Amino acid sequence: VIVLDCSPARDSNSANVGEGQLGRGLLLRYHDRSMLSFPELIAYQEEMAKKAKVKTQYFSSPGGTDAGAFHKSGEGVLTLTHCICARNLHTCSTILDVEDYLAAKKTLITLLNDFDQTRLNKLKGVRR
């Protein structure tokens, strides 16, 4: 399952440091309160971003996404959160960087074109 989502930017203070900055590309969301991402799936996402020639940034969140519910369903489901960050989430004035959006879109298309049964079997076989 690939969950498309938006995470809160953490670049609104004067220090402009930390994970989740506008203009820094696709978020490689490796942890949140609802799931621990599958390391090999994050590595694959990063590989596809490099292939698509887009910027990425690692991201951990105290919040969660719908990915958590998928991740824990049944016997567990390989789940990837494909995100960008934005300011003022859940308001009528959310701000995002269009280049981040385009980076996420380009990476997703690259990943979907590359993904096949062989890749799925390889990912599923890693933890057995």
Question: Predicted regions span which residues?
Answer:
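Active-site-adjacent substrate-binding region
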Residues: 24-105, 111-128
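Acidic/histidine-rich catalytic neighborhood of metal-dependent amide-processing enzymes
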Residues: 1-27, 119-123
